[in-house]
Every structure is written in C-alpha cells, then in structure tokens.
C-alpha cells in the first residue's frame, strides 16, 4: 500500500492513499514505492474511487533516504547503550532488540558495558557490533582487546572502568541508556546518564530507593534527561497513564500524580516461592529454596529479595519517588498468576491495569520506544487460557520486610538508603546460607533503629557524598551486627 504525507498550510499529516481530501486542494505528498520515494507537489484532487490522482500541474522529485529521515517519513533508528548487558535485564534487552529488528530496523546497539564477563561481552559484540565496548574490571581489559581482534573489519572503541562508563554516557551518538546493573553500583551510571541529558531506561530500583531525592535534584538541573521505569510493576503503572499528561512532566518530579490524576496505586506481586509456607516452615528455608521463583527468571539478588518480599518493599519506595504518590496510597497485592503487573486508580475511581505474561521484554521495549509502541512477534495474551486471576493481601508477619520498607519510606530522610544498604548485606548472607530467613529482617531492623536522621545537604555533590557515606555506614553496621551475633 502506498503511503503519503500531506502538508496543508505547513501542518503535516501522515495518512494512507485512500484518504479523501478536498478537490483541487493544494498539497504536497510523499509517495513510497518499494525502495524508492518521491515527493509530489502542486494541485492534487481525488479520483472517482477516492484515490489520490495528480493533475498535469503536479511535479515529482525522487527522494533519498536521508531526506525521508529529515522530514520524519522514515524514523531514525534508536541508538541504545546497555549497561549490564550480560545480566538478566541486559540479555532480555538484546533479545527484544534482536526480534524487533527482524521486523524493521528500529534499534542500533551503540554500546555494551559489563562488569567482568569478557567472553559473553565478546559474543554480544560479534552479533551487534557496537561502537563502544566497556568492561568495568580492568584486569580483563587486555583480554577483551585481544578477543575483539578476531572480529573481521570491526574496530570499536574499547573502554574500561568508571571512566569508560562516563565516556559512553557523554557520547552524542547515544539516545537511550538501559541501566541493568543491580545493587547500589547502578547509581553511578544512572547519575552520569542524567548529567548528560540521556533518556534512562532504569531497571535499578536501588538507585531510586537510596538516592531518590538526589536524582530528583539532578533531573531538575538537567531538563532534557528523563527516567523511564523498566521494573515490570512500574512500567505497568507508566503504561496506564495518558501520554499527553505524562509529557507535561516526568518521573521523579513533584506533582506527577496530580498532573496525571492518580489517586492510588495497586502494586502487584507474585508472592514469591514462600507465599504458602507457615511461620515454622519459613524458619528453615534456604537460599536454594528462595532461588526457585515460580514465575520470573532473574538474577540471584533480586530473586532472594522476591522471596523475602523486600523486593516489593523497595518497589513501594520506588513508586513513591517515581510517581509522587503518598505511601498511604500504595497498596501491595499478591497476584500469583503474574498477568496483571500493576493497577492505577484515578481520581474518578476508575482503575486501569496493564496485563501480559511474566516477561521482561515488554517493559524493556516500552522504555526504549516510549512514547511510541512498535510491532512485535511476542506471544499474544490468551485470557481464556489464563482463566482465573486471584488477589490477596500479603501477611506482614510472614514477610516483615514489607513493613520495614513502609516504615523507612514514611520516615524519609536517609532511612530508605539505610534500608537498602543493610538489605544488601543481609541478602548476601542469606544467599550464602550464613543466616536464616527471619534474620534478614532482624538485621535490617536493628540497623534502621541505630540510624539517626541527618540534615540533607543542599549541594548536589555534597549530597551524593552524604548518600555514599550513609550507605557505607549501614553496610558496615549490618556486617557488625552479624559478626557479633555469630560470635556469641
């Protein structure tokens, strides 16, 4: 089917060839035929079958691809950097990019950044041929350079460490950056991406939990930077909103919920692998049990957090910061089928939800294409096959980490920073079977009780230092609590 662009009084409308236009109207049209495109201009009118015909006064000029990109007839591919490309988020991002590019060339992978997985990075480089490769661990930097020599006619810019990450963030050839680095380490790359006015597809909830007010300050300074949530629940909330309203503001800004008419958020959770266990059974679970998530395939840290439901607690704080929603208006709901990922109740009390199978490719894709959507070949949702959707409230007795997260969030100040840091230590101790299930919440609770509120620095640089110091203090305190308990 031929496609045209009509320009009336300097306004552009994209349409197809059977649109009725007024007889003898002055118009300019772009006609696409196979691999060629032409611009027609002059006096156009409808034929008897309502198809566009051209009078003798029309002229035609052949266009090149660059002309079409410049006027918007063909969209320029989105240039993407993926930080943590060998992790769960990174590999999912590359999977959906690969599949979408089979339909239409939508994405260019411009940069890949990993911690130390040199062989996996090499394989990704062979396929996607990015302009930049960066490895954080300097000890394998030379190995990466030698491996890349095996790729014929490929000469990327090979970087390492934080300096390499900063160079990628500052590149003018990159439009969007996927932050798939977990834990507090992801904050650095998020910060530098914002400082370079990038659109950040953020999967690192710890950045927002630990430094939400710092990121808000940065986003106010760097006006063109945006954070688009990748977490399935927060992507679901974001997808439920009216883009016309979203475009008037951005995530992590005051009055976001007011502008978007948000009244309440229902934050959905699978419940994790321990949802049906008794208190006595929970006392004896191991990390091996926790890593068997019933629905999602994720990294170890987030899978443990899902089992304790601390992941949902962190997401409550993330929801508060991202969408400017009061903690009393965020409700956690266990939805074991994982079809509805979250719901938004608006001020008129209507509720909109986003639904799909538990698959991170959808939220990752939306974070890259927003405010648009593109065609995919993903499996369509079959509601008849799903059949039943269930919901219930989680037990705070069985999952005390949720309660701790609400308490830390409501206290504000640096309590979410302390919560996140102490959880990193407790999570790792449980992962290595050094503590029991309920010891996780016990350690976190003791660290929170030991912390005293501090005055928040006004200067952005000083505030970042303050967050780092408190994060380090909380990790040390959690480790100290474990060591004292272990030695007694």
Curated annotation (Swiss-Prot):
Transit peptide (residue range): 1-72
Protein residues bound to Mn(2+): 231, 233, 315
Cofactor binding note of this UniProt entry: Binds 1 divalent cation per subunit. Mg(2+) or Mn(2+).
InterPro entries associated with the record: DXP_reductoisomerase (IPR003821), DXP_reductoisomerase_C (IPR013644), DXP_reductoisomerase_N (IPR013512), DXPR_C (IPR026877), DXPR_C_sf (IPR036169), NAD(P)-bd_dom_sf (IPR036291)
Molecular function, one GO term: manganese ion binding
Signal peptide: none
Co-factor requirement: Mg(2+); Mn(2+)
Subcellular location: Plastid, Apicoplast
Protein keywords: Apicoplast, Isoprene biosynthesis, Magnesium, Manganese, Metal-binding, NADP, Oxidoreductase, Plastid, Transit peptide
Pathway the protein acts in: Isoprenoid biosynthesis; isopentenyl diphosphate biosynthesis via DXP pathway; isopentenyl diphosphate from 1-deoxy-D-xylulose 5-phosphate: step 1/6
Modulation of this protein's activity: Inhibited by fosmidomycin and its derivative FT900098.
Pfam families in the record: DXP_redisom_C, DXP_reductoisom, DXPR_C
Gene Ontology CC: apicoplast
The enzyme's E.C. designation: 1.1.1.267
Binding site for 1-deoxy-D-xylulose 5-phosphate: 205, 232-233, 270, 293, 306, 311-312, 315
UniProt: NADP(+) binding residues: 86-89, 115-117, 206, 299
Class in the EC hierarchy, top level: oxidoreductase
One Gene Ontology term from the biological process aspect of the record: isopentenyl diphosphate biosynthetic process, methylerythritol 4-phosphate pathway involved in terpenoid biosynthetic process
Binding residue positions for Mg(2+): 231, 233, 315
Reaction(s) catalysed (UniProt annotation): 2-C-methyl-D-erythritol 4-phosphate + NADP(+) = 1-deoxy-D-xylulose 5-phosphate + NADPH + H(+)
HAMAP family on file: DXP_reductoisom
NCBIfam families cross-referenced by the UniProt entry: Dxr
Described purpose of this protein according to its UniProt entry: Catalyzes the NADPH-dependent rearrangement and reduction of 1-deoxy-D-xylulose-5-phosphate (DXP) to 2-C-methyl-D-erythritol 4-phosphate (MEP).
Family membership: Belongs to the DXR family.
Database matches in PANTHER family: 1-DEOXY-D-XYLULOSE 5-PHOSPHATE REDUCTOISOMERASE (PTHR30525), 1-DEOXY-D-XYLULOSE 5-PHOSPHATE REDUCTOISOMERASE, CHLOROPLASTIC (PTHR30525:SF0)
Protein name in the entry: 1-deoxy-D-xylulose 5-phosphate reductoisomerase, apicoplastic
Annotated organism of origin: Plasmodium falciparum (isolate HB3)
Lineage, uppermost ranks: Eukaryota, Sar, Alveolata, Apicomplexa, Aconoidasida
Gene behind this protein: DXR
């Amino acid at each position: 089917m031929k496609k045209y662009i009509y320009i009336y009084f300097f306004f552009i409308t994209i349409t197809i060839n059977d649109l009725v236009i007024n007889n003898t109207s002055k118009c300019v049209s772009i006609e696409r035929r196979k691999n060629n495109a032409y611009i027609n201009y002059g006096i156009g009118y409808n034929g008897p079958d309502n198809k566009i015909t051209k009078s003798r006064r029309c002229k035609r000029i052949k266009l090149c691809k660059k002309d079409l990109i410049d006027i918007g007839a063909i969209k320029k591919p989105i240039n993407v950097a993926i930080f943590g490309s060998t992790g769960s988020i990174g590999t999912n991002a590359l999977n959906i990019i690969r599949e979408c590019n089979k339909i239409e060339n939508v994405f260019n992978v411009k940069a890949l950044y990993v911690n130390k997985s040199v062989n996996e990075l090499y394989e990704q480089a062979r396929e996607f041929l990015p302009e930049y490769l960066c490895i954080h661990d300097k000890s394998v930097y030379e190995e990466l350079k030698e491996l890349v020599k095996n790729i014929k006619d490929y000469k990327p810019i090979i970087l390492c460490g934080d300096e390499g990450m900063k160079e990628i963030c500052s590149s003018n050839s990159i439009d969007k950056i996927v932050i798939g680095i977990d834990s507090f380490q992801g904050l650095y790359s998020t910060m530098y991406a914002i400082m370079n006015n990038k659109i950040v597809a953020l999967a690192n909830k710890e950045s927002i939990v630990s430094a939400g007010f710092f990121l808000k300050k940065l986003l106010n300074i760097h006006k063109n930077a945006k954070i688009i949530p990748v977490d399935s629940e927060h992507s679901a909330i974001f997808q439920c909103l009216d883009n016309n309203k979203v475009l008037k503001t951005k995530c992590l800004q005051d009055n976001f919920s007011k502008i978007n008419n948000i009244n309440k958020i229902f934050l959905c959770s699978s419940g994790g692998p321990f949802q049906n266990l008794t208190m006595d059974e929970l006392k004896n679970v191991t990390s091996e049990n926790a890593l068997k998530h019933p629905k999602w395939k994720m990294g170890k840290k987030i899978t443990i957090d899902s089992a304790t439901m601390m992941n949902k607690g962190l997401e409550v704080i993330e929801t508060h910061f991202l969408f400017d929603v009061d903690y009393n208006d965020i409700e956690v709901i266990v939805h074991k089928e994982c079809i509805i990922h979250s719901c938004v109740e608006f001020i008129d009390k209507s509720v909109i939800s986003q639904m799909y199978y538990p698959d991170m490719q959808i939220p990752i894709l939306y974070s890259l294409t927003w405010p648009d959507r593109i065609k995919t070949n993903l499996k369509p949702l079959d509601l008849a096959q799903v059949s039943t959707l269930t919901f219930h409230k989680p037990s705070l007795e069985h999952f005390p980490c949720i309660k701790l997260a609400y308490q830390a969030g409501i206290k504000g100040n640096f309590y979410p920073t302390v919560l996140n840091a102490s959880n990193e230590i407790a999570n790792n101790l449980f992962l290595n079977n050094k503590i029991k299930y309920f010891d996780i919440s016990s350690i976190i609770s003791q660290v929170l009780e030991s912390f005293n509120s501090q005055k928040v620095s006004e200067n952005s640089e000083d505030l970042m230092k303050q967050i780092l110091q408190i994060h380090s203090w909380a990790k040390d305190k959690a480790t100290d609590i474990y060591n004292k308990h272990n030695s007694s």
